[in-house]
From Swiss-Prot:
This is Regulator of microtubule dynamics protein 1. It is found in: Cytoplasm; Cytoplasm, Cytoskeleton, Spindle; Cytoplasm, Cytoskeleton, Spindle pole. Coiled coil: none annotated. It comes from Homo sapiens (Human). The modification N6-succinyllysine is found at residue 165. Keywords: Cytoplasm, Cytoskeleton, Microtubule, Repeat, TPR repeat.
């Protein structure tokens, strides 16, 4: 109300007006009264109370708008704080390996417009799909659900490296249900998003690792898939084990021992390049990696089997 009081004091027709503020006497009729009176082309209303009330209402309306703005800004701050709190909870559950609890938390906010929340939901959906106890029917639904969340995250923020990364991952997963032709057709799109993720965040070891997987996959592509690729593209996607190895090593340099699968793939790539000594080194690291997730356990098993396999051949 302070603003209203100030406006009231500035009104020209208030009681106790300063000397000289009244209109000159005798401009229209006797005794110095104005009928309404005309003064140099302006008509001044003869009821000052009406004018006061109108101006006061305008002041109050302005104050109401200012209050609305303050409340709106406070709501935005509160909503932002709430999202930050949810993200902290989500990251804690992810680091703790609480896959299903994380999914349950984030699905409550599946209608969110926040890219950071949406890509985490895409990741959580995919992680639940990969659990051994998830049925094939549920897995398929979760894979497509994950792609939708990742797509929305990317639409909300194209500058989010994680949104590019998870969109590419989820698009690749969907290819498992749509056939080899669709998977190859999406190959360049997937590669572009991995490259964009690396460009936006060169220190993200996971994006670099995934680019290595892309190279490894196309390096070992069987002949019949290469034929399909030639039908789809004038220049079909291709790569080499050397390129894959470069990405896996680069990921390891950025964040040593960040992921058991990177260690496994370093070993497998060296096997493809017939370097058994270095293959054994990396496979041993994969086998001894502390198992925090179900995937880690699967990788430990595969690494142990590969070590046994080529040790027996020697």
């Amino acid at each position: 109300m302070a603003l209203a009081a100030r406006l009231w004091r500035l009104l020209p027709f208030r009681r106790g007006a300063a000397p000289g503020s009244r209109l000159p006497a005798g401009t229209s009729g006797s005794r110095g009264h104005c009928g309404p009176c005309r003064f140099r082309g302006f008509e001044v209303m003869g009821n000052p109370g009406t004018f006061k009330r109108g101006l006061l209402l305008s002041a109050l309306s302005y104050l109401g708008f200012e209050t609305y703005q303050v409340i709106s800004q406070a709501a935005v701050v509160h909503a932002t704080a709430k999202v930050e709190e949810i993200l902290e909870q989500a990251d804690y559950l992810y680091e703790s390996g609480e896959t299903e609890k994380l999914y349950q938390l984030l699905t409550q906010y599946k209608e969110s417009e926040d890219a950071e929340l949406l890509w985490r939901l895409a990741r959580a959906s995919r992680d639940v799909a990969q659990l051994s106890r998830t049925s094939e029917e549920e897995k398929k639904l979760l894979v497509y659900e994950a792609l939708e969340y990742a797509k929305r995250a990317l639409e909300k923020n194209e500058s989010s490296f994680a949104s590019h990364k998870w969109y590419a991952i989820c698009l690749s997963d969907v290819g498992d249900y749509e056939g080899i032709k669709a998977k190859i057709a999406n190959a360049y799109i997937i590669k572009e998003h991995f490259e964009k993720a690396i460009e936006l965040n060169p220190k993200d070891a996971t994006s670099i690792h995934l680019m290595g997987i892309w190279c490894y996959t196309f390096a070992e592509m069987p002949w019949y898939q290469r034929r399909i690729a030639k039908m789809l593209f004038a220049t079909p996607p291709s790569s080499t084990y050397e390129k894959a190895l470069g990405y896996f090593h680069r990921a390891e340099q950025v964040d040593p021992n960040f992921y058991s699968k990177n260690l496994l793939l370093l070993g497998k790539t060296y096997l493809k390049l017939h370097n058994k000594k270095l293959a054994a080194f990396w496979l041993m690291k994969a086998k001894d990696y502390p198992a925090h997730t179900e995937e880690d356990k699967q990788i430990q098993t595969e690494a142990a089997q590969l070590l046994t396999s080529f040790s027996e051949k020697n």
